[in-house]
């Protein structure tokens, strides 16, 4: 049992699924990249043996699923070995990939090693827009090939479509693409604006009319395709009246491990300054980090909350919303998430969204290890 100062004692069981960011290396240059602003270099990454130790410990403490992610996880030459080890210790394995580095032979080797599921990101339904958004020529065609190979190998497939102002008009076609690829699930995820995406907000922010059309399209498709294609949907917080229950609440249902072994309450947590995130390299067990690390306990439960969250009837439903967004927009990770109508900043961010959506700006600051490249510069 974990004692949280300022609140009742609560029990936080080990999450059933964990995200493993094997590397921050990636051939794509997406303008909404969710990796931290300070990317971890290849030389800092956990070794094969270190990742195997992590996988064994995760299985031992009760984790059931691991999601191999990045960056681009297929940039790791030892990925097949890691998938095989995860399978041997009893973990369900999911690969979250841009797919552009995969050959059919390597995908088959991953399947033989026990890979259970593949999730491929798509930047659009056709190559011109998709390749421009990802900053990678030929990427869309390669993704289509890998998606087909995935189904030929009898692996379940999820299509992950990251949506924004410059591709939302393609949503009906993306739904049809997911069907044509025989995907089991489609994730329609509007960009969330922190980290690198915040730098490109003016080029990415959709209009409210676009979001309303998007929502109607998703709802109609869910009804039409019930039992055929599962569709998950996330809207941009700037147009919401209530904050999302981010990651199920800070330190309640989720953690991920960075390429260098840092254990994080969410993949964007490093955007919050002043928090120290323990590493699996420093000798502490993952279970002990989950239970006792100050970074996890800082915003766990409700005892940390300021007003109006502290007296809100929804505080144990949304747990104050997103801490990373509160820090990015309010400068205080303990502040009310500005996505909430009770935040004094709510009207301001709504107006910001409307203004930037109407700005006409469409040039991207691409994400890469050089720090960023302006489109067309």
Swiss-Prot record:
UniProt: [4Fe-4S] cluster binding residues: 26, 30, 33
Cofactor note: Binds 1 [4Fe-4S] cluster. The cluster is coordinated with 3 cysteines and an exchangeable S-adenosyl-L-methionine.
Example of a GO MF term: cyclase activity
Alphabetized Pfam families for the sequence: Fer4_12 (PF13353), Radical_SAM (PF04055), SPASM (PF13186)
EC number: 1.21.98.4
Catalytic activity line of the entry: [PQQ precursor protein] + S-adenosyl-L-methionine = E-Y cross-linked-[PQQ precursor protein] + 5'-deoxyadenosine + L-methionine + H(+)
Keywords: 4Fe-4S, Iron, Iron-sulfur, Metal-binding, Oxidoreductase, PQQ biosynthesis, S-adenosyl-L-methionine
PROSITE patterns tied to this protein: MOAA_NIFB_PQQE, RADICAL_SAM
GO biological process, one term: pyrroloquinoline quinone biosynthetic process
Functional pathway: Cofactor biosynthesis; pyrroloquinoline quinone biosynthesis
Cofactor: [4Fe-4S] cluster
Domain Radical SAM core residues, every copy: 12-228
Subunit structure and binding partners: Interacts with PqqD. The interaction is necessary for activity of PqqE.
Function summary: Catalyzes the cross-linking of a glutamate residue and a tyrosine residue in the PqqA protein as part of the biosynthesis of pyrroloquinoline quinone (PQQ).
Family: Belongs to the radical SAM superfamily. PqqE family.
Protein name: PqqA peptide cyclase
Species this chain originates from: Rhodopseudomonas palustris (strain ATCC BAA-98 / CGA009)
Lineage: Bacteria, Pseudomonadati, Pseudomonadota, Alphaproteobacteria, Hyphomicrobiales
